[in-house]
From Swiss-Prot:
Residues 300-405 form the PH domain. It comes from the Eukaryota. This is Cytoskeletal signaling protein slm1. GO terms for biological process: actin cytoskeleton organization; cell-cell fusion; mating projection actin fusion focus assembly. InterPro entries: AH/BAR_dom_sf, BAR_4, PH-like_dom_sf, PH_domain, SLM1/RGC1-like_PH, Slm1_PH. It comes from Schizosaccharomyces pombe (strain 972 / ATCC 24843). Effector of the TORC2- and calcineurin-signaling pathways. Mediates actin polarization via inhibition of calcineurin-dependent transcription. May play a role in the response to the disruption of sphingolipid synthesis, where dephosphorylation of slm1 leads to the activation and phosphorylation of ypk1 through the TORC2 and PKH1 pathways, which in turn phosphorylates orm1 and lag1 to activate sphingolipid synthesis. The lineage of its organism: Eukaryota, Fungi, Dikarya, Ascomycota, Taphrinomycotina. PANTHER family: CYTOSKELETAL SIGNALING PROTEIN SLM1. The keyword Glycosyltransferase does not apply.
Amino acid sequence: MELSGKSEFPTRTEIPNQASNGDAVPNTDAYMGLCNSLTYRFEGWRHLVENLIAFFKQLESTSKNNAKEYMKLSKVIVHPYKDANVFEEHGIQDIFAALRDQTAAIASDSEQISIQLPGTIINILELLREDLREHCKKIAAEGTKGVKVVEKQRAETQKYLSLLDRALLPWRASSPPTVNIKNDPFIVDRQVLNCLARQVQEENNHSVAVAQLQEFSFRFEQNLIAKIKDTVKQFEGMMNQTHVKAINHLQEVVRVSEAQTLAGEWTGYAKREPEFIHGSVPPRSVDAIKYPGKNDQPTVPIMAGYLIRKTSFLKKKQRGFYAFTHSGYLYEFKSSDSLQDPEPEFALYIPDCLIGRPSEKKPKFKITGKDATKKIFGARNDYAFRASNNTELMRWWEALNTHIANVNYIQPLSNANGPSAVSDSDDDDDDPNDFRPAVERQSSTMNTRMSQPSSAVNTNRSYGSEQIPSYADSQGNSGANNNFIYNASATGHNAWNV
């Protein structure tokens, strides 16, 4: 690594010397601890750079994956739309086309990042890691080499110091000893000075080398930090450029979206659809609809309107809409509205029923029969029916009996008792207002065959050639027989066995 820049390392007037205490052979490590500390420090820097390399390599992999995912995302958009003639060619589909194209552009930008990272950042960091590895080797090599030389010279000096000590030992006696040249303290001392001079020279050289290595390490660390800062700056510029592109892509989608009008697609659809409704359409009416069988005789009731029914066993009054059909059924509905009440609540099959005579005082008569809907349990029950007036009552009564006569139905005579009598005092609490709401009739102009008031019912009337038994005959005195049934085989449709 080429180092540059002015050093900011603190200057020293003197190179520190571990032997400044004056010992010939100092008990020190010759800066071995400092060299080890520098080595450990830059090994830490190398690990930090390796971590940064791993980060950018993962970013490279992430960018590649993002490019693939964004490209896959762009292919989710179907354009043009598979259902033809649903949308305008340059309407809402333009938004989807913009989404697809701009998403593909984002994928391309992500792929570009994965291409730029190795050349601009990762390779530089890998070179920096190699420089750190070499620097650590240099610290170890130079530091170890100098220490070995110093230690060798110190050992040599220590050897001659020991020889000098042995040479001086005889001279500590009272009389001077006899010595040879090798044992002469003067010669040995000169040898000590020679070794000590070489030792000090090596120590000084080693101290200078370690100081220079320390200064170089300081500048190396400065350059190392500068490289990392440059790398981060490059990364910031790269990502900022990518984000600006992403924003531009999204803004393009928004621009295409804003160009669409709210009614554009619908206007195009209205032009393409041949059956599109322009303007208002008159509403359909059920009454105006014609269908097969409408207004055929079996579908139109013989008689229809509101009646009040009272059951003998429950003593309960119930007002309902009644319809007597050509099928012979007398149906009861909650209301006349077929939309709300299409199914009957109660029904009597008239040919199987016994019809009593009308009351002489009140507009009512009785029918004995069985509920055809099976909602009322039991075999046969007596049902009293009351109309709004005598005229209405006789229209109902005559319609029922006329139908029985037309079908030539013979009622079995096994039930000789017939319908029970209706008391004249029964239903005294009926409210005339019960019949005021929209009573539906078959025809408001239908000719009635009974227009006399109820007081006139006491006299015998003729309907064809038949005699109608009076209501009083059915009310049963203690000794009178009030049982009566209708016999269709007799003369006329009002033939009764009383």
